[in-house]
């Protein structure tokens, strides 16, 4: 389900938690409702994920919306991102996300228009990584601005963005052939990955 607010956080436990013999649960997830989607990772888990070049954590750190944070801690964590970022893993992550979202959301003759962005964003992120630009920006507007696209395709995306802002998140409409053609081409192209550094 979709929610109005996605809340992501990192947390620490009291010292006793870290001295346990067994490995306790290191994730907090609350049931999703219409307003909130809340989940967080324990600090040590987050550091391990960063070391493993986890793109999801890297996106969390680049979120344009921050409700609360410890500036010094987050600044230090962000400074580690270039050290651990893996173009190969990021490309695979975004390509897989685009495939999954396309199959899950854009197969009917009528589709929920905002779901196009669930596919376009990871596909543009794949292009960003393949171009050697480093970590893809979280903001779709920055990702779009840094992408070289056919003028007609860019106009179609811009029009869809305007329509989404006017009509809201839930609007349905007929599938868009130009966008579908681009998505199909990018997914087919992505099956043969380029050589990227690990």
Predicted regions located by residue number:
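An N-terminal structural lobe/cap that precedes and organizes the functional/catalytic core
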Residues: 1-69
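Short, mixed-charge, low-aromatic patches
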Residues: 2-6, 74-80
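General structural signal for secondary-structure boundaries
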Residues: 14, 42, 69-72, 86, ...
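Short amphipathic alpha-helical patches
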Residues: 29-31, 42, 69-74, 104-105, ...
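Short secondary-structure capping/junction motifs at helix and strand boundaries
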Residues: 53-78, 85-94
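Conserved nucleotidyltransferase catalytic core and NTase-mimicking acidic/glycine-rich helix/loop elements
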Residues: 76-197
């Amino acid at each position: 389900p979709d929610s109005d607010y996605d809340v992501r956080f990192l947390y620490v436990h009291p010292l006793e938690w870290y001295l346990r013999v067994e490995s306790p649960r290191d994730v907090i997830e609350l049931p999703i409702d219409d307003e909130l989607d809340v989940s967080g990772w324990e600090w040590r888990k987050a550091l391990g994920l960063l070391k493993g070049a986890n793109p999801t954590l890297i996106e969390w750190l680049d979120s344009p919306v921050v409700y609360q944070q410890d500036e010094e801690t987050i600044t230090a964590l962000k400074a580690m991102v270039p050290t651990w970022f893996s173009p190969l893993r990021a490309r695979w992550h975004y390509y897989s996300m685009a495939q999954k979202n396309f199959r899950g959301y854009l197969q009917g003759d009528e589709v929920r228009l905002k779901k196009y962005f669930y596919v376009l964003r990871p596909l543009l992120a794949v292009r960003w990584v393949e171009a050697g630009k480093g970590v893809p920006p979280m903001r779709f507007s920055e990702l779009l601005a840094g992408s070289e696209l056919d003028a007609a395709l860019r106009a179609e995306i811009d029009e869809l963005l305007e329509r989404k802002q006017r009509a809201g998140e839930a609007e349905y409409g007929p599938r868009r052939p130009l966008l579908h053609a681009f998505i199909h081409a990018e997914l087919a192209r992505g099956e043969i990955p380029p050589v990227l550094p690990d």
